[in-house]
């Protein structure tokens, strides 16, 4: 994978890790206002997850990279996003737009991180839908662990 430069999230933590991955998935936005995006189409998404924290686990990890890949790539790669429960409601915060995909990945990753004793936090999720279009989701400061 080609090295990427991402917008950086400011945070007070000592450690920061980033996990890159690609997800090939289809979706559609069931709204007339979405234009061509209302038809089923696909992307090879580039996803970057930024996790930060002050404490390492017993293995010396902030979080195991392979777990992050399983949480995201394992769930969404080669699927129709609209078929996932995460994107099945007919409201603007459940439609599989790049914005909602980024927030949903954050929610799923943070839910896992909350189970870890060392309490790392997801500070940013970057989702690139096309070479020229991407979204960054960062939780509001009150949402960070700490």
Swiss-Prot record:
This is 6-carboxy-5,6,7,8-tetrahydropterin synthase. InterPro entries: 6-PTP_synth/QueD, 6-PTP_synth/QueD_sf. The active site is at 37 (proton acceptor), 78 (charge relay system), 129 (charge relay system). One of its GO terms (molecular function) is 6-carboxytetrahydropterin synthase activity. Keywords: Lyase, Metal-binding, Queuosine biosynthesis, Zinc. The active site is at the interface between 2 subunits. The proton acceptor Cys is on one subunit, and the charge relay system is on the other subunit. Catalyzes the conversion of 7,8-dihydroneopterin triphosphate (H2NTP) to 6-carboxy-5,6,7,8-tetrahydropterin (CPH4) and acetaldehyde. Belongs to the PTPS family. QueD subfamily. Zn(2+) binds at residues 27, 41, 43. It is an enzyme of class 4 (lyase). Pathway: Purine metabolism; 7-cyano-7-deazaguanine biosynthesis. Its EC number is 4.1.2.50. Its cofactor is Zn(2+). Signal peptide: none annotated. It comes from the Bacteria. Pfam families: PTPS (PF01242). Transmembrane segments: none annotated. GO terms for biological process: queuosine biosynthetic process. It catalyses: 7,8-dihydroneopterin 3'-triphosphate + H2O = 6-carboxy-5,6,7,8-tetrahydropterin + triphosphate + acetaldehyde + 2 H(+). The lineage of its organism: Bacteria, Bacillati, Bacillota, Bacilli, Bacillales. Binds 1 zinc ion per subunit. Homotetramer.
